[in-house]
Amino acid sequence: MDRSEIVARENPVITQRVTNLLQTNAPLLFMPIDIHEVRYGAYTLFMYGSLENGYKAEVRIENIPVFFDVQIESSNTNQLFLKSLLTAENITYERLETLTQRPVMGYREKEKEFAPYIRIFFKSLYERRKAITYLNNMGYNTAADDTTCYYRMVSRELKLPLTSWIQLQHYSYEPHGLVHRFSVTPEDLVSYQDDGPTDHSIVMAYDIETYSPVKGTVPDPNQANDVVFMICMRIFWIHSTEPLASTCITMAPCKKSSEWTTILCSSEKNLLLSFAEQFSRWAPDICTGFNDSRYDWPFIVEKSMQHGILEEIFNKMSLFWHQKLDTILKCYYVKEKRVKISAEKSIISSFLHTPGCLPIDVRNMCMQLYPKAEKTSLKAFLENCGLDSKVDLPYHLMWKYYETRDSEKMADVAYYCIIDAQRCQDLLVRHNVIPDRREVGILSYTSLYDCIYYAGGHKVCNMLIAYAIHDEYGRIACSTIARGKREHGKYPGAFVIDPVKGLEQDKPTTGLDFASLYPSLIMAYNFSPEKFVASREEANSLMAKGESLHYVSFHFNNRLVEGWFVRHNNVPDKMGLYPKVLIDLLNKRTALKQELKKLGEKKECIHESHPGFKELQFRHAMVDAKQKALKIFMNTFYGEAGNNLSPFFLLPLAGGVTSSGQYNLKLVYNFVINKGYGIKYGDTDSLYITCPDSLYTEVTDAYLNSQKTIKHYEQLCHEKVLLSMKAMSTLCAEVNEYLRRDNGTSYLRMAYEEVLFPVCFTGKKKYYGIAHVNTPNFNTKELFIRGIDIIKQGQTKLTKTIGTRIMEESMKLRRPEDHRPPLIEIVKTVLKDAVVNMKQWNFEDFIQTDAWRPDKDNKAVQIFMSRMHARREQLKKHGAAASQFAEPEPGERFSYVIVEKQVQFDIQGHRTDSSRKGDKMEYVSEAKAKNLPIDILFYINNYVLGLCARFINENEEFQPPDNVSNKDEYAQRRAKSYLQKFVQSIHPKDKSVIKQGIVHRQCYKYVHQEIKKKIGIFADLYKEFFNNTTNPIESFIQSTQFMIQYFDGEQKVNHSMKKMVEQHATSAGNSAGNPAGNALMRAIFTQLITEEKKIVQALYNKGDAIHDLLTYIINNINYKIATFQTKQMLTFEFSSTHVELLLKLNKTWLILAGIHVAKKHLQALLDSYNNEPPSRTFIQQAIEEECGSIKPSCYDFIS
């Protein structure tokens, strides 16, 4: 069944109507999905999408004018001069037209408002681009000068959205298989203003399953034996989750199912070709998968390349254009597309973009919707949305079923694969992804592809230009090319009032916020580039003529920046571009929110089974999508105005907005203080205010005259909240009237959001409390939290639980007559319970997440990933599976725990086991599999104590001296130190570790003194050897004999050291029989050898004396080598003195770790006797025969 048959089956009535319209050449509705340009030769724009009934359609738009504008000094400038410039550069153009427009930068008075421009028309984009580059280099200002995507300019000029219904008129029509082809001119396209009918575009959701014979690894398309063995697809209407058809293409026999059609292929090559064939039959408008841009598409493309069929596959999938392989790889295989996830994070996508089908990776969409999600798997996102989960089928079982070719089990694999595809569509529909992106495209005159793959800034730019170029906004000429020097620096910071830290249990605190501060400032003060006045002389001249100006000044990069903006004084004709656009967006959103409210009320009254419920639900979703798109643009507006890479960037405007925000918050602050209110905290756009005590006098007196029960106290708190709400409502109205008088407009307003009571401020942007919005609500389980670490991404359940316990306990209503425990007491009580009662914590409480960003200097993650890389390499050497230690994709989050390492000390009692986080991190799966112990103390010290310190750092004992600049940091550090000592006092294991360290230090001090005595004796003996010139050999032998006597057998030394350790460890109250005691003995003996190495270094430095000694020995050895191929024997002739000396040398040099010296000379001896030395095994055998068994053998010297 192909697409046309599905459409006819599902939509027979609409299909008949569309057929009749086609036969009579009547106007048709068309929904564009994908856009492609023909940029060579005559410019042509292709739009792909569907007709009203779901037929696949291609709309070819011809005769699109190709032009750009260039500003000239005066209208009298002869066009011949511009023609001569272009001709001199061999730039071919069609014609020139003169017009007038308003430049976007700088204020121009009424009589000089418009400037002359010349519009230059071309036959091709190539010549246009050459001309733009040339004239910009010559210093001319250009407009309508898009150089990357010309279709955006076409959309703006024609006011033709690329993501909503378009009416086709006066078209020429040609059916072509599954595709209905139309040819039109720009005049034949009419934007359809109504919502239009239900969209019947088709979505194909798919999933692939891959196999590798190397167990435990992720299949790699570059490995010949790794294959894709199954591809499952489901198609849907774009708005529905009910499948229209399903197909499973497999290389292993699969039991038939009524839920899908099975296609059995004999090879991977045939499977890929079948996928392309099925793709072409359904001709989807959108192709979607989960993480397919990171895995599925790269796998399919790479395997198609290996089989030499990528060109054939592309041309099967593309119903419109057939291309050669090099063109496919260059223009249609998007190998690295950076997709913005959040302000800090981007992700690389790869996909095959066939004309007419838009690829969408559902994982990328979900990550944009949940930028702080700690888990980004399909299962996690389904759980977040409350959708049915995916099927649980481990990979090792799937691969086993594929290897055994069990048809019933392969049916389970097919079902698993099909359901994964189904869940992709479920997520797209649940999140209203396509309608939301379409509304953004309608507002910004960009394509659906732009709305999915580009950040918000360029869409705001495009929307601004679309508003600017039309008559109702003054025909402002806008360029898309950023000009001028781009400076980097900080704009004026926000006005901040330091919080009054601590727990407030007596008076409610109310938040007063500016509504959309920066957009409101732009509307109030007429911040817009074409309203900017740069010089004081011009500003004075304008004010003398009666103009009202808003002055801005601020410091930027150590200089004063100043300027003026001509105010609109509420006169529409005087409003700048930015305020006009924002006011239009605001009015539209207000109307939509009102409609949304009415639709929501209707939804509440109608049951899901009602015939009109689905239509109502659809309408509600569409209106919601429109108001969301408007909100996105309003919130992104200032970001683009302050972006120094934007063509609209103006430094005085960007800094002027923030400095005006400072001014207005200070204004409100002073107004509120003068009214007798108190300020708890203020930052950027909000103030937290307390009412005067007199407001509560009456209700407080009533409580004091009551029996003061807890019920009476709760009633008192209830009435205080109500009084605060009423007072704040009045204050808010007074503040807004005060602001209106100050700035002359009603755009800048504050709103009362909530009353917080009780409330606790712990730092800047860090506070929590019980929020009362419409009515009092003292539920401690629903806290209002801002900036506290428990809501921080990556935090463990342990930290969240402890933090929540502290906050909930501190929010309980307590009468003044009762004991009100201070925060420090609450923190210590909760912390003690957490530390002492360790059994209450489960493994899951310690799981945390982090992001792998190779370019970021996150030392712990870098160390951890380095360790995992080393593990993978080690396992690969032994042919073992290493997938459990796989490195995440850059930007991807991964889960881990901190595990406990054995406590170790050096000889001086210092901890030698690594305390670095990166050395203690382990993947969750690995820690679970090996049952590794969790380092609970690490979590307490490194995560929990910092959080707990935040609650108590306002205590007097933690406050810094007056000369400390960063008082909050100082207090936080002191509070954390205090809690660390508290934990050490209650944690038994920590005390044990400290005790072990003390014992080590005591033992070291005693034993080291004994070692030094012995070393002194050895040093004196060898000094005698160096100074004895008459008989150095005899002196050396005597020194060696003494050393052998002292170190005769490692056991004696160990035994001696053990006795010393036991004696002093026992006296210090520690058992030497434990592992730590044994480790201490090993460490002490190692230190002994280390001290002796100093003598070895002295010997090495006396190299000449050693060389003479060894030369004497060598010259007295008759070293004969027979032909070992025949005799298989090596003969030595030693005197008894020489053998004894060799034995002594062997033991002495080994003990002194001087093998490197002996090895150097003895190896030289071997090399001098034979150009081709015997094999190592042969030498070892010969020496053992002649010298007997020496442990360690003399072979160690030679080899």
Curated annotation (Swiss-Prot):
Coiled coil, from the record: none
Keyword Cell cycle among record annotations: no
Catalytic activity: DNA(n) + a 2'-deoxyribonucleoside 5'-triphosphate = DNA(n+1) + diphosphate
Keyword entries, A-Z: DNA replication, DNA-binding, DNA-directed DNA polymerase, Early protein, Nucleotidyltransferase, Transferase, Viral DNA replication
EC annotation from Swiss-Prot or TrEMBL: 2.7.7.7
Domain of life: Viruses
Record SUPFAM superfamilies: DNA/RNA polymerases (SSF56672), Ribonuclease H-like (SSF53098)
Induction annotation: Expressed in the early phase of the viral replicative cycle.
Any Pfam family the entry gives: DNA_pol_B
GO biological process: DNA replication; viral DNA genome replication
Gene Ontology MF annotations: DNA binding; DNA-directed DNA polymerase activity; nucleotide binding
Listed PROSITE patterns: DNA_POLYMERASE_B
Anything else known: Consistent with its intracellular location, ASFV encodes its own replicative DNA polymerase and three base excision repair enzymes: a class II AP endonuclease, the repair polymerase Pol X, and an ATP-dependent DNA ligase.
Similarity comment text for this entry: Belongs to the DNA polymerase type-B family.
Function per UniProt: DNA-directed DNA polymerase involved in viral DNA replication.
Name of this chain's protein: DNA polymerase beta
Organism for this UniProt entry: African swine fever virus (isolate Warthog/Namibia/Wart80/1980)
